[in-house]
Amino acid sequence: MAPPLSPGSRVLIGLIRVYQRLISPLLGPHCRFTPTCSSYGIEALRRFGVIKGSWLTVKRVLKCHPLHPGGDDPVPPGPFDTREH
């Protein structure tokens, strides 16, 4: 079971949701990764909290450019992730 979300994580997830609903449809699908960078950001914030989740999200967004091949890039397992790998 994941820990409850901090207020900071909730705010950042809310901002990402605004981007997904209002800005992303205007830009069209162009993320080179699976999951998309915004979905990755939400999952990273949920798994790791505001500090590490934000850092992982920033690193991911900085990789999303035409010179990077993209592809499958899931969020790393979190401390409360009980799935076997």
Swiss-Prot record:
InterPro entries: Membr_insert_effic_factor_YidD. The keyword Membrane applies. Keywords: Cell inner membrane, Cell membrane, Membrane. It comes from the Bacteria. It is a peripheral membrane protein. It is found in: Cell inner membrane. GO terms for cellular component: plasma membrane. PANTHER family: MEMBRANE PROTEIN INSERTION EFFICIENCY FACTOR-RELATED (PTHR33383:SF1). This is Putative membrane protein insertion efficiency factor. It comes from Enterobacter sp. (strain 638).
